[in-house]
């Protein structure tokens, strides 16, 4: 099964080199929930800017400040520690007065705003993230300029980034050990990380193999197609292939790949046969996902960064910004620009 660094590129392997995070200010992320606080309710939403802090540590510090259990503070997603990030935390405070949030202090953190809300903020309940990056020590400027234009027009493979798999692939190691021995990781969150990593790696393998053999825009009989920007999908039939191919070429529809698990994968006929053959050697992980009742799903094979903008500070330093939907990875965009020796396994999605 493919390592992230050996997955196929949509625009060919880059020739250039570059560095992704020389300092925290080079990697800035602003969370986009997609909704505003209600203004009333038993929950408190707090928007925080943090540098050099991981999300869980900030949540625990907020719980301590508010005098509540750590489990009463939630967030929509983990954000990178070695970066400047803005995100919302949610604290359940039924029947309590509005706390003096400006008095909350934690090194590297700043409270930006806060308001009451009616519902708990759950993991994954965000629209997306806006990234502002400074890329340094870049070579092959002309090639990277061309690649930025290609990415803007044609997107990138929607790979799960290496951070999904843990440092040194630790989450995948846990999943394979679990599959082989039947012994799950002791901690609940590590079990979740292992299962997520297993099917994410298989998704990456499907996309890379499809890209190599057919291209990610070639519609097959039985493909599961998704309306761009939507989560629902439908299955192609032989009679519709010509019309659906035109809609894929125009960007109206996206071809999906399986997030394997229990139940129907969604594809049929030729597309299903391709997915099954590609993952034929992964019976242990597939059995694990089925046994643990991880429901199969679909994910678009292509990712289109929105509002992609860039500006050169000098010939070797590039500022680039873009918006990605929840669950997408900035590292999967950057890998289409240049090669990097930086360890990006700790960059949160």
From Swiss-Prot:
This protein's UniProt keywords: Isomerase, tRNA processing
A cellular component term, taken from the record's GO annotations: cytosol
GO biological process: tRNA pseudouridine synthesis
Positions of the TRUD domain: 155-303
GO molecular function: RNA binding; tRNA pseudouridine(13) synthase activity
Family: Belongs to the pseudouridine synthase TruD family.
Protein's recorded name: tRNA pseudouridine synthase D
Organism encoding this protein: Cronobacter sakazakii (strain ATCC BAA-894)
Highest classification ranks of the organism: Bacteria, Pseudomonadati, Pseudomonadota, Gammaproteobacteria, Enterobacterales
């Amino acid at each position: 099964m493919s390592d992230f660094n050996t997955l196929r590129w949509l625009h060919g392997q880059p020739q250039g080199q570059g560095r992704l995070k020389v300092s925290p200010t080079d990697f800035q992320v602003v969370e986009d929930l997609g909704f505003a606080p209600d203004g009333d309710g038993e929950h408190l939403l707090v928007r925080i800017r943090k540098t050099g802090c991981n999300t869980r540590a900030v949540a625990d510090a907020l719980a301590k400040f508010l005098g509540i259990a750590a489990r009463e503070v939630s967030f929509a997603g983990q954000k990178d520690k070695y970066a400047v990030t803005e995100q919302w935390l949610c604290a359940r405070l039924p029947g309590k007065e509005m706390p003096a949030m400006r008095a909350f202090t934690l090194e590297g953190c700043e409270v930006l705003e806060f308001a009451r809300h009616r519902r708990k903020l759950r993991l994954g309940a965000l629209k997306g993230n806006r990234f502002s990056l400074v890329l340094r020590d870049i070579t092959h400027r002309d090639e990277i300029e061309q690649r930025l234009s290609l990415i803007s027009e044609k997107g990138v493979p929607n790979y799960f980034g290496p951070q999904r798999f843990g440092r040194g692939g630790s989450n995948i190691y846990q999943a394979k050990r679990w599959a082989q021995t039947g012994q799950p990781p002791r901690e609940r969150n590590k079990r979740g990380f292992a299962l997520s990593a297993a099917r994410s790696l298989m998704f990456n393998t499907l996309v890379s193999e499809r890209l190599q053999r057919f291209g990610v825009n070639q519609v097959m009989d039985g493909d599961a197609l998704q309306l761009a920007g939507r989560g629902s999908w439908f299955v192609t039939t032989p009679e519709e292939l010509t019309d659906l191919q035109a809609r894929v070429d125009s960007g109206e529809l996206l071809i999906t790949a399986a997030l394997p698990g229990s139940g129907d994968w969604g594809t049929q006929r030729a597309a299903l046969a391709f997915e099954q053959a590609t993952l034929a050697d992964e019976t242990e992980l597939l059995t694990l996902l089925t046994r643990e009742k991880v429901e199969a799903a679909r994910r678009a094979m292509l990712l289109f960064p929105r509002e992609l903008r860039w500006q050169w500070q000098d010939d070797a330093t590039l500022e680039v910004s873009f918006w990605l939907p929840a669950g997408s990875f900035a590292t999967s965009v950057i890998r289409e620009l240049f090669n990097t020796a930086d360890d990006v396994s700790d960059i949160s999605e």
